[in-house]
Every structure is written in C-alpha cells, then in structure tokens.
C-alpha cells in the first residue's frame, strides 16, 4: 500500500505505508528499551493561541528582555532540519507554534538522537524561551524537549490525503488533525449549543433529560430502532422523539423546559438525514405557536450574532437574514406565491388541485384529500424554493396528530414549520391538550396505519400512558423541535449533515 506523506525537508514523496510503519515501530522499540516510551509526567502551562494573542504586539527585543519561559505540547505538523538547528511546528487544540531547537540549547548527542527519532505526527512537549525569528514569527527557543507520544502511522499530506469523503468520516481523527476547516466547524458546533443553553437559561427555561429507550415508539411518525431488555423480557425502542415525555413534565408543573439530545430513526441516509441525530425540543406553558415563533426568532438572532458576529450569514450562494422577523405564510399562500401560474386557478377545487399536481409530475393517490394534495405540492415543489427564514403555517390536521386544532378552521392545526435555505429546520405547534381528541387521533394513527417492523405488524402511536397523563390536565402549551445538525449546517456553510456530525453513520467496511 502506498500513499503520499511529507518528508522531513517538506518535499512530498510517495511512501510504502507498511515500510514506514516498520521504521516507526523500530524507533518505538528503541524508546521502550530506554524506558521512555509514552511518558505521562509532562505538564504544560501555555496554549499556542493564547501566546500568539498575548504577545502579538511584543517585539523580539522586548521578548528577550522579558525572558518568558513557557511549556507547551502538541503534534508535529512540519519539520525543517538544517544541520545543528531545526525548526519544528507543533499544533495543539487552539493553533500552531514554532519550536527552535539547536545543538547548543540541547546537548549535541541529545539533539542528534532526538531529531532522528521524531516523525511527523509525533507529539512533543517542550520548555523554552519566547522569541521572534527574523521573519517576525513568534517561536520558542527550546531548552528541553521530550517525545510524549510516538505516531506509528504517517499522516496523509494536505494535498493528496483524505480526498475521499468517506475516509474523512470514517477516520474523523485524521480529518481533524489535517483539516483546519473541520476543526473550526466542530468548535462552532460546540459554541452554538453552549449559546443555545445560555439563551434558554436567560429566558427561564429548565434543561431536562428524558428516556432514550421507550416501550412505545411515539412522539413522531417514523420507523424506530428496536432493542431488547433481557431482564424485563421486552422489546424497547430507541426514541424517535422525546415529545410525549416532555409534555408529561409540563403536566407535572415544569412550565418552561427544553432538552438537547439524540433521537434515532431507522430510515434513509442523505445529505440532510442521519439515523442518529441531535434534536432540541422546547415546551412553554401558557403560550401558543405564535409565541414559539417569536422565541425562535430571538434565539437564532442571539446565536448568529454572538457566535458569528452578525445576523446576516452566508450559506452557499445565499445571504440569510436573521435580523428581521421571519416571514409567515400558509401552505396555500406559498403555492400561489412560488407558482404564479396557479394564481388564476381555483386551487381550492380538488379537480384543479389534482390537475396542478399532475402537471408538476406528482402521482396523485385517489384517497388524498384536497389538503393532502396541497401538502404534497408544497413538499415536492415549494420547500426548496424557500430561502430566507420562513414560518409556513396552516398544516392539515390529518398530518398533525399532536397539534391543537385551529379555532376558526378545525381542518387545520395551529402549527408551523421553519424553513431556511430550502430545508425544514424546525416543527412547532400549539399542543393538543384535549385528551378525548388526542385519543381519537391516536386510534386513527394506530389502527388506520400500520408499519412492518421485523416482519410483524406493529400498531404505532397509541400511548395509553400519555393519555392518562393528559387527563390530569395539560395547560395551554406550545412547543417546537429544532434539528440541531441542520442548524449547524447553516451556521458553518456545510452542505451535508455528515460534515457536522463527528462520527456519522456509515456502512461497515
């Protein structure tokens, strides 16, 4: 097996990986013989980025006068060996810094011995004095340097290595070592989730945790993953949504709650779907879906400003505006707006709606209602046209089993979905708190629709325990589920969900 790696003089050469492994293993064997392989008694007092920031405006003359000694550690990413002096660049979690090593600063025999043993990818610990090179680069004149971890496998170089996307996902650790943009993406992800938590705390929401294993696959319409509890002797389901447990907590008196956690759906994999994904759900008592829209607007405005420094962000060719209130539009209004040719037609006539759908290449089923036809036209044709943050309302009650009916038009739910850059980011609604209405809808879901799981017909979405809880009284409540991974895609200008999940689901090799 061959691959491209950097040589010590920074040229790039073709190596046989097995040969390189053998060479590095021999070096490790020598370290073991000396009893210095993989030491764990080195401590650092500095991080590269902190040093660069703190001494950004300090001249070399001032640094020499200050005589600042630091200890630092990181992975070798480049080496320049010039006889009795060498420059080595190491990278830690925050950035890079250059080490300057000479046979004068270390004993000559120690210098020669160390340089021969080090390879790209090795992890070093160093102690030395800060100075600037002739080119002005902040560096460390090393008094002591130690090999902390020997890397047995050569790193791919930045030009030829990890061009295969699947390799990046399968060996994410290599992607993180080599690709600065990947590291930046996941740092932003962490900051975004942290800022979301801070925002929710400031708005008096309590973070909670609900079960990951359910005895009933409820809370959403999706295929679950099935597992088995040996002691209880029952099948259980990895949760497809935490919704019903969270609403039980609202019934119990927690009026403002949220959860950020994983959900699992045994369905397709695509650029916007991963079977294991991170979702945030928010529930607020004494509120309706319009209050949730305002909350989410403020949340995203805060996150974009604090993490990215602006409410206007770039995503691909689009400039997304989180500064102004989100557009609100019904499904019917969206059809008329994005398909101007339909404005002269009566789309409330089912025959006309069928004709429009067929003209768009949609195969219409005879059992579909008018609202279902509108919904499919929207999903198949309109969604991808919505670029700016937009709350789409007036969803049919028939596809909204947990949402409250609209008072003025009971055929529709008090529900909205948030679309940005052509994709659904969130789904929110005023919660159904009428236990008898909820029971009727559960029955329709459970006995009107069956899923085949493990070759058995399994009735879905009938949760008697939730109905009992609902009979104790759920206050007027609204909630939303937000796809965190999709949100991170927007905020990092990523175009596949795999780029924002550290270890996405892959088929085994």
Swiss-Prot record:
It is an enzyme of class 6 (ligase). Its cofactor is Mg(2+). GO terms for molecular function: ATP binding; lysine-tRNA ligase activity; magnesium ion binding; tRNA binding. Pfam families: tRNA-synt_2, tRNA_anti-codon. Its main location: cytoplasm. GO terms for cellular component: cytosol. It comes from the Bacteria. Coiled coil: none annotated. Mg(2+) 2 binds at residue 424. Signal peptide: none annotated. Binds 3 Mg(2+) ions per subunit. NCBIfam families: lysS_bact, PRK00484.1. Homodimer. This is Lysine--tRNA ligase. It comes from Blochmanniella pennsylvanica (strain BPEN). The lineage of its organism: Bacteria, Pseudomonadati, Pseudomonadota, Gammaproteobacteria, Enterobacterales. The gene is lysS.
